[in-house]
Swiss-Prot record:
<feature type="compositionally biased region" description="Polar residues">
    <location>
        <begin position="1036"/>
        <end position="1050"/>
    </location>
</feature>
<feature type="modified residue" description="Phosphoserine">
    <location>
        <position position="1343"/>
    </location>
</feature>
<keyword id="KW-0963">Cytoplasm</keyword>
<feature type="modified residue" description="Phosphoserine">
    <location>
        <position position="577"/>
    </location>
</feature>
<feature type="compositionally biased region" description="Basic and acidic residues">
    <location>
        <begin position="1329"/>
        <end position="1347"/>
    </location>
</feature>
<feature type="repeat" description="WD 1">
    <location>
        <begin position="6"/>
        <end position="72"/>
    </location>
</feature>
<feature type="region of interest" description="Disordered">
    <location>
        <begin position="1326"/>
        <end position="1355"/>
    </location>
</feature>
<feature type="modified residue" description="Asymmetric dimethylarginine">
    <location>
        <position position="950"/>
    </location>
</feature>
<feature type="region of interest" description="Disordered">
    <location>
        <begin position="829"/>
        <end position="850"/>
    </location>
</feature>
<feature type="modified residue" description="Asymmetric dimethylarginine">
    <location>
        <position position="945"/>
    </location>
</feature>
<comment type="similarity">
    <text>Belongs to the TUB family.</text>
</comment>
<dbReference type="Pfam" id="PF01167">
    <property type="entry name" value="Tub"/>
</dbReference>
<keyword id="KW-0677">Repeat</keyword>
<dbReference type="InterPro" id="IPR056159">
    <property type="entry name" value="Beta-prop_WDR35_TULP_N"/>
</dbReference>
<keyword id="KW-0597">Phosphoprotein</keyword>
<comment type="function">
    <text>May be a substrate-recognition component of a SCF-like ECS (Elongin-Cullin-SOCS-box protein) E3 ubiquitin ligase complex which mediates the ubiquitination and subsequent proteasomal degradation of target proteins.</text>
</comment>
<keyword id="KW-0853">WD repeat</keyword>
Length: 1543
């Protein structure tokens, strides 16, 4: 045979484990019974009793397979005993568990519907020496030390009892194999025999000097007569039908042996109690514990060595270790297992068909793997290698065949799952939600205030093996407010030792096992009021179990001990925040590492923010809002906003700069941060996230508030802009800043706040006035200069950034290629929040937004970034990890700047990945820096501007909507990506629609799509990548319309799209210099959001400054929206041939975006059209890049048309075509269509998609050429209907003809919004698809803008929407708006979009899109008119609810995809039921909660409970939670709840 202790961390409880008992799994139904019994014993349950009076029931498995599913709950801590549990005994036939404590209390537990409850209670006040079930499980033998013995039935009826008068105590009692007699052992070496009816049969003296420690038979513990041992049982050991159930083995062939162990360590093997010549085993061990395996052929004897005394002088303690010896039925020694255990082994038991031997020593539990046969060489090698490796992860380093590696890894698969999967990395365990349905059952205990520590401390323990494993510690840091810091519970021990072997010694030595911190948790005490106790009313001793009795004096001591427990370290490094600095922490070096999160509150304790302090955690971990009745007579209403926390690469982790002091006191709307709250460049993280913005779902919140709330929640995504940009951001930012200034001097020039967000922002105004290109030209001049001047420089920057970000040879080679990082766009979106209040938008990143718009001139060659190039583009390098987190700046309801971090999504990746290879590319990047600069000043101006007419969004939120839209787009992260991909796919699917949409976007914005055409000029490198995020900016379109229906809203819009995303970044200066592209992109979005006109202006300006328009191929960061196609479920939407095309960058072709001076090409907004069909792609593309900034007329708008039909997917890709066509397209800058652009914000596809996508040349027809476009002037009514029609029906047909014939003609399809997207409907089908796609896209991205503007347009059909659209707000593409508008649009369109959505897994853009990220976009939408759409779909009761629905949807469908980075779950507590009898509100906690309290609550998500909290003692609570809660988040919510001024 062979035996070895299992590898892996030592399993520990918080107190000494005193007894063990194991049982196999029970078949769940009759159908399972015929299955081989062996399977039943691969899984089982281990019962443990400990010194804290808690019984642990823990799941075990021996199959060594990780793929096997485990029960949702693998550990139960059963409380109820008043003193240490000394005996646990399973009754396998009846599936009951008997437990006895030191005071004589006996509980019989039974499990029903997943919960354990006490069935029987017996307490006669005397110590129980033994409790044994008969072999058939029908009777129980109870023996007391005072000589009283009792036999009762399994149901609790007493059969007989007797008082045995002895001078010594009874130490043990057992049944004979036939259950006809009972034997008792005494402390004076005697054996007393009685029959099953209580008649005395004999007294036998076995040993004169040694007392009997224990007795047992080498016979199965239970005999179960069931059909499980049927002929179908293939088990080798299958016993006869009446064989032992536990381990069916032909035991009957072996004559039963009575085994008696004595205090001396000797063991006698007897045929019967009267055997005169027993076989004596002299083990040489002290404190012996012996047990036969169930098969009856192997006796395990565990004890401490005696011979160690020889070496005791020098190092006796080291030699003194426990060992296990194995003997056969003849008493022959077979094997000795030496262990490193240096404490006595208190209890052992066999399990899993004798393949495991479980040993308890102190608080530690050891699992020994036993091989009964001669061990194979393979097994010996496995154990030798495993003991050398020590860790499972090292197996992969060996050069072994896969089968051997797999076999070797089984040595590391634990029989009992450890509480923390990786003891060396507990941070991950507490920071991220558990996978699947795994639920963590914890206990939270308050420890007394300690002067050293400061305020009261709470420790969160994970229930395990009947004990508590500390995983988090919280300390109150303010006497005025319920504010806490959450930290690691570690003390001086090394992190890896916390739960390792050192834990045992520390717990044992420091806590002496009896005072470990848990017990005070009052696990024992909690049960004091347990119903089981009350049921024991018939027991005379019941009062002893009363609560008073349970309040043992140990409690305070234990509490103190707890605070000293090595596992509850006292050291608390200071985080550096003023509130924390007052405390002194000895371990300054660990300071940053020890604080994980902070819970901040308003003065009233009704709103809480959970802020991540650790570098690896998102800054925003959630928020809790309480709403109570005036008199506190009704249960409180809790609303929890919980951002999903996903693990991200450390590369993208940024230390969040969170100001815990920033908390809006009572004002819900007042964020603490001011306009400057959004740092210009580097300090993106400094922005505070006000708590006030968060509102309970039950409360009405302004759109702004909603947005702020969502965004702040999104903050959970962590991080900072810098994260997004990474190092490159810093550099790029700096460089860009310089460039920006240069590039966007106009911004400064147009100091006019609304006007100049980006140097060209003024453009909007200009455009408004002069729809013609003329306006654009002026900015163009400066812009061009910028472009030109920066063209090289930017080019360099971009190149640099491209190289840095996406080390792609292509980019480097292209040198000029501008790399617009989608991520920046995303960040921009953050900034965009400014929405509602113009002033509010402090430095809204709007100014930053512009960069993307103009991709500086890039060589026409670049324009066509081929798929390959695009792939290059995906500067995923920057944040290739998608991400870590991106910091989003938003404005809360009061207009304060709020910064939130959200995990970057792949989308992000794609965004920043897009780099324009063109030489002029850098120009775009340049923009970024400028954007940053300009944005701030302009931001607010822009905001004002936007707020005014620009965004006619229904609510005052419009400004934010754009931001939000961009944010949403990015916040949507995956969702947005989905959107984009959706759009993409949609386009693919419905090339027509997509084309239309693209065209619309392109057209609306101005045929900027011409950008591609622009490539004609050599710099046509228009093929800039449109920022994926920029699409969100599209909503700025509304701003354009806001400028005036007739004014060139288009231009503004266009800029908006692109700028919006960038803006937010600029605000934060997210872009690292290397990531200049990125910077520009984000900034652009933001800025655009803030001021579309400005943004556009900026963008246009830049191109103007740079090379001539034609030359300046705007390197729009073409959102890699299409990239997501593959990544997002949405791809599904257009999984048709179109889908493939979608991936083509055709839509992206827009890159050359010619932005008229006035028109900012908002790449972000441009919907990407996948190159579905050649012709349509072009159109699609256009829509995709609705920006079509009217570059000086030269931008190849016209060419696009030409190109469009032909290249559609691929030609569009080739910027050259567009470039060639550059002439006509000149998008008439002021043309409202530019707005249209905005309306169609493209989603950001995954970087891969992006790269594959090319910017399809948008048919940038001279705006004049579009009759449809002009209608855009009044997008609200006219255009919308027209586009509607086009999109909806003719979408393909009429426009197709138009577009197709025109190719230049852009049919403005205001699919989702009233963006007049110029769709080259070269391919009538394409347009339709485009439209659908665009719709969807818009829905998401544009919904905000669309809600307003699109609404209006659709309102063309729907008047109400028209109201918002009046300003071309429709162009603002806010996802919600878009959705609403879409809905309004026409049922037909709606149906289409729905179908599309289905394809994409989105039911309805607005509803199906699970914008889990609830980027401000959704919130905004919700707050705004889009809220109607949202509500109409889900009729959420409040914005919070809307978010919730969104989150829910996303979570449901994303499967972690959409929600992976930034979904915000909105949950509420379950309303308790009123109990008339007791006059209290009650909840069903499944027996886990033993005291009624107003603080008890349960949280539900989608109808299933995901968290529950309840009191079990005066200072102890239970806390159970599962996904989406991480331990840190759940603990923070519990701390917030505990401080409520309620009973």
């Amino acid at each position: 045979m062979y035996a070895a202790v299992e590898h892996g961390p030592v399993l520990c409880s918080d107190s000494n484990i005193l007894c063990l008992s194991w049982k196999g799994r029970v078949p769940k139904s009759e159908k399972e019974k015929p299955v081989c019994r062996r399977r039943y014993y691969e899984e089982g349950w281990l019962a443990t009793g400990n010194g804290r009076g808690v019984v642990g029931v823990t799941f075990t498995s021996s199959h060594c397979r990780r793929d096997r599913s485990t029960p949702q709950r693998i550990n139960f801590n059963l409380r109820g005993h008043n003193s240490e549990v000394v005996l646990v005994r399973w009754n396998e036939p009846y599936q009951k568990l008997a437990t006895c404590d030191a005071d004589g209390g006996i509980f019989v537990w039974i499990q029903y519907e997943g919960r354990w409850s006490v069935e029987l209670v017996n307490d006669r006040g005397a110590q129980v020496s033994d409790f044994t079930w008969s072999h058939d499980g029908t009777q129980a033998l109870i023996s007391y030390r005072d000589g009283f013995v009792l036999v009762g039935s399994v149901s609790g009826q007493r059969h007989w009892s007797s008082e045995i008068n002895l001078e010594s105590q009874i130490t043990c009692g057992i049944w004979t194999p036939d259950d006809q007699q009972v034997l008792f052992g005494t402390a004076d070496g005697q054996v007393i025999v009685m029959d099953c009816h209580g008649r005395m049969l004999a007294h036998v003296l076995l040993h004169e000097s040694d007392g009997v420690l224990g007795m047992s038979w080498n016979y199965p513990i239970f005999l179960v007569e069931d059909s499980s041992e049927s002929d179908t049982d293939s088990d080798d050991y299958a016993p006869p039908q009446d064989g032992p159930a536990a381990y069916p083995i032909p035991v009957q062939n072996i004559k039963p042996l009575l085994t008696v162990s004595f205090t001396s360590g000797d063991i006698s093997l007897m045929n019967n109690y009267d055997d005169l010549s027993p076989t004596v085993i002299r083990s040489g061990l002290k404190e012996v514990v012996a047990q036969w395996c169930t098969q009856g052929d192997l006796l395990a004897v565990a004890g401490m060595e005696r011979q160690t005394q020889l070496g005791e002088l020098p190092n006796g303690p080291l030699l003194k270790s426990a060992m296990v010896k194995f003997y056969n039925v003849r008493g022959e020694h077979i094997f000795t297992l030496d262990t490193l255990v240096q404490r006595p082994i208190i209890s052992i038991c066999w399990g899993h068909r004798d393949s495991r031997l479980l040993m308890a020593s102190g608080p530690a539990l050891y699992v020994v793997r036993v091989e009964h046969r001669v061990s194979s060489l393979q097994l010996l090698c496995q154990q030798a290698i495993a003991s050398t490796l020590r860790e499972d992860k090292d197996v992969s380093k060996l050069t072994l065949p896969p089968r051997l590696c797999s076999y070797l890894s089984t040595a590391f698969i634990p029989t009992i799952k450890p509480p923390i999967p990786d003891p060396n990395n507990m941070r991950d365990f507490v920071s991220y939600p558990s996978a699947g349905n795994e639920r963590l059952h914890c206990t939270m205990k308050r420890t007394e205030d300690d002067p050293e520590v400061g305020g009261p401390c709470y420790t969160l323990y994970l229930e395990y093996l009947g004990g508590l494993v500390p995983i988090l510690k919280g300390r109150r840091i303010s006497k005025l407010r319920p504010e806490f810091v959450i930290m690691d519970p570690r003390t001086d021990s090394k992190p890896d030792e916390i739960y390792g072997n050192s834990l045992i010694s520390t717990v044992i030595d420091s806590c002496n096992c009896s005072d470990s911190s848990d017990i005070e948790l009052s696990d024992d005490w909690a049960a004091k009021k347990s119903p089981k106790i009350s049921r024991a009313s018939k027991s005379p001793k019941l009062p002893r179990i009363s609560i008073e009795a349970r309040k043992s004096p140990k409690l305070p001591r234990a509490a103190q001990e707890l605070s000293r427990s090595p596992r509850l370290p006292l050291r608390k490094p200071s985080v550096g925040s003023p509130s924390l600095t007052r405390r002194e922490f000895p371990f300054e070096d660990i300071t940053q590492h020890n604080y994980l999160a902070q819970v901040t509150s308003n003065i009233w304790g009704t709103k809480f923010k959970i802020v991540g302090l650790a570098a690896f955690l998102p800054t925003n971990l959630g928020a809790v809002i309480y709403k109570t009745s005036l008199l506190h007579l009704q249960p409180r209403q809790m609303t929890i906003y919980l951002p999903e926390v996903r693990k991200i690469s450390m590369d993208y982790i940024n230390l969040p700069v969170f100001n815990p002091n920033v908390f809006s006191e009572d004002e819900d709307d007042l964020p603490v941060t001011g306009a400057s709250g959004v740092p210009e460049n580097s300090p993106p993280c400094t922005v505070n996230i006000p708590i006030a913005p968060i509102h309970s779902s039950a409360q009405a919140m302004s759109p702004t508030q909603s947005i702020g709330l969502v965004q702040s929640l999104l903050a959970n995504q962590n991080v900072q802009l810098d994260v997004l940009t990474n190092q490159t951001t810093a550099v790029g930012t700096a460089e860009h800043a310089g460039d920006s200034a240069t590039q966007y001097p106009v911004s400064n020039r147009y100091s006019n706040p609304g006007q100049v967000i980006f140097g060209s922002v003024e453009m909007g105004r200009i455009i408004q006035n002069p729809p013609p290109l003329s306006l654009p030209p002026p900015p163009q001049g400066p812009m061009q200069l910028s472009t030109v001047g920066h063209g090289d420089r930017d080019h360099e920057h971009l190149q640099k950034s491209a190289k840095a970000l996406r080390p792609t040879p292509q980019l480097a080679a292209e040198g000029d290629a501008v790399v617009f990082s989608a991520p920046q766009e995303v960040q921009v979106t953050k900034i965009n929040p400014p929405p509602p209040y113009p002033g509010t938008i402090p430095a809204a990143p709007t100014t930053a937004a512009p960069p993307p718009p103009l991709p500086p001139p890039q060589p026409p060659v670049d324009v066509c970034l081929k798929k390959g190039d695009f792939s290059l583009y995906p500067t995923s390098v920057h944040y290739q990890t998608p991400l870590g987190y991106e910091r989003i700046t938003t404005f809360d309801s009061s207009g304060n700047v709020e910064e939130v971090c959200r995990p970057r999504t792949r989308m992000l990746c794609s965004q920043n990945t897009y780099t324009l290879p063109g030489p002029g590319s850098s120009a775009t990047l340049r923009l970024t820096a400028t954007e940053k600069k300009v944005p701030q000043p302009c931001s607010s101006a822009t905001l004002n501007r936007l707020t005014v007419p620009r965004y006619s969004i229904p609510t005052g939120d419009p400004p934010p909507y754009p931001e939000i839209a961009s944010q949403l787009a990015q916040g949507r992260g995956a969702a947005q990506r989905s959107d984009n991909s959706l759009i993409h796919a949609t386009l693919r699917r419905n090339n027509r629609e997509a084309t239309l949409k693209m065209a619309q976007l392109a057209d609306s914005p101005r045929a900027p799509l011409q950008p591609l055409a622009k490539s004609k000029g050599g710099p046509g490198g228009v093929v800039t990548q449109l920022p994926a995020r920029p699409p969100p900016a599209l909503y700025t379109c509304s701003q354009c319309s806001g400028t005036g229906p007739s004014s060139q809203p288009g231009a503004s819009l266009a800029h908006t799209a692109s700028a919006s995303p960038l803006a937010s970044q600029s605000s934060y200066s997210l872009l690292s210099p290397p990531d200049s592209a990125r910077d520009r992109t984000d900034y652009v979005n933001s800025a655009f959001t803030e001021d579309e006109a400005l943004s556009q202006h900026c963008q246009l300006e830049k191109p103007l400054r740079h090379p001539p328009l034609p030359e300046a191929a705007v390197t729009l960061k073409r959102p890699p929206p299409y990239q997501w196609d593959p990544m997002l479920g949405e791809d599904v939407w257009v999984p048709q041939e179109r889908t493939a095309q979608t991936s083509g960058p055709n839509p992206l072709k827009l890159s050359s975006l010619m932005l008229s001076q006035g028109q900012h090409l908002d790449v972000s907004r441009l919907p990407f059209i996948s190159p579905k069909s050649p012709a349509s792609p072009t159109a699609t593309f256009q829509t995709g890049y609705g920006m079509g900034v009217p570059y000086p007329g030269s931008y190849n708008n016209p060419p696009l048309p030409g190109v469009q039909a032909p290249c559609s997917p691929k030609d569009a890709l080739s910027p050259t075509q567009f470039a060639q066509q550059e002439p006509a397209v000149v998008l008439q800058p002021l043309y409202p269509p530019s707005l249209s652009y905005c309306t169609l914000p493209p989603m950001y596809p995954g970087s891969s998609t992006c790269s594959s996508l090319q910017l399809p040349p948008v048919a940038l027809h001279p705006w004049s050429s579009y009759s449809a476009c002009p209608p855009m002037q009044n997008p609200q009514g006219t255009l919308p209907p027209k586009p509607h029609l086009v999109v909806e029906k003719p979408l393909v047909s009429p426009p197709p003809a138009d577009l197709q014939s025109h190719l230049g003609t852009e049919v403005m399809v205001e699919t989702a919004d009233n963006f007049q997207e110029v769709l080259s409907l070269t391919e009538s089908p394409v347009p339709q698809r485009t439209e659908k796609f665009g719709k969807k896209n818009r829905k998401r991205l544009d919904s905000r803008a669309e809600e307003g503007s699109v609404q209006a347009i659709t309102e063309g059909k729907v008047k109400k929407e028209a109201r918002t659209l009046s300003d071309f707000n429709s162009l603002i593409s806010s996802p919600h708006l878009g959705r609403e508008k879409k809905k309004v649009k026409s049922q037909k369109d709606q149906l289409k979009s729905k179908k599309l959505n289905k394809t994409n897994e989105f039911q309805d853009s607005s509803e199906s899109e699970p914008e889990l990220f609830i980027s401000g976009d959704e919130l905004m939408n919700q707050s705004q008119g889009s809220r109607k759409g949202w509500k109409s779909k889900r009729s959420p009761r409040a914005a919070g609810e809307l978010e919730e629905a969104k989150c829910r949807r996303a979570s449901e469908k994303e499967d972690g995809r959409l929600g992976s980075q930034g979904f915000v779950y909105v949950m509420a507590n379950k309303q308790p039921l009123w109990n008339e009898a007791t006059q209290v509100y009650q909840l069903d906690f499944g027996g886990r909660v033993t005291q009624e309290s107003a603080k008890n609550f349960q949280i539900e998500l989608e109808g299933r409970q995901v968290m529950q909290f309840g009191r079990i003692d005066g200072s102890a609570y239970i806390l159970d939670f599962q996904y989406p809660f991480s331990a840190v988040q759940a603990f923070a919510v519990a701390l917030a709840n505990v401080t409520q001024r309620l009973k």
